[in-house]
């Protein structure tokens, strides 16, 4: 479970909840602006799309899915399925047209953020994947596992990838 501040409106944030919902809040308000029924099981992560052109969120859940939402219309744009266990996180890359997800199945998945097609699956044999950090100025992505961490240099080659 986490919270994410909207980069387009720093007075708005989203929270992911084990009750299967994502709530959108205004800073200072004791009640959410609205609640979205997001996943069939607990929601582990929520993140806003960093660009100005789309009002999107990405969420992950214990239902093994990654979902992209239009938070203005409160509708699911796409459900991405490929992980075989709870999905710990998913983030929009700030500079490249990809979504990066990590799961308790031990894999990192790279998705095309325009077509939502799975582009690559990485498995370093370090057990469950738990957390991610992006270097906004570059294309490095750090991923934390049960048994260590990996720093990836992500770049586009051909149609997409590492």
PLM feature segments, named:
Residues 37-43, 80-87, 122-129:
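WD40/WD-repeat beta-propeller blade N-cap
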Residues 1, 9-12, 32, 42, ...:
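WD40/WD-repeat beta-propeller blade-loop signature
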Residues 29-34, 73-77, 115-119, 159-162:
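Beta-strand initiation motifs
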